């Protein structure tokens, strides 16, 4: 058997049907993400992307099959313990009123300023924070109303990194970033020391071109698993997504 110590996330014939729903949201999903890998998740609206990643921090439990996190069945973890190891950054950035510093300290209240700046650098937020008159002490309005969409997204990614998770899930959370910032963020995450495993859920194929594996979902089923170049040859659904974006000019590097 494979060495489970090297596995960050393993799905073994996983299906998920939400309570009260007639049809399953996920059907028979199997894959293994090794520690340190970047995993892309792509598919059309309603394909099951959020359902898949919701199983990793145990927002829900699989109806069938097994989900293993860091070598153990997900159900063996108390949810609170799992949330320390798995950080999820949603598309809609949630920020509370206070300052940039207090916003980041939600990730880890004992973090030193050096840790905050390191997280801001990785999240491509350090430059805009430095440009603020008060830096880390700059006020943040409730919901981050005084920040742009891209600034809010970068701050919530930095906040997640301050918690030093083992698994980071970006659920379409770079959607407000331009391509250059998005690419710089992915490069910085890949360069982090240690074995951080990153799941990037994206509508943009261009954001996933350098992922170690890409999971392609269609109607709750996995219709492709592999690297970008291979999927273009073997997975019609992926090829179609990429071609439609490439025509529109969305698939810039």
Predicted segments, located by residue:
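ABC-type nucleotide-binding domain
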Residues: 2-253
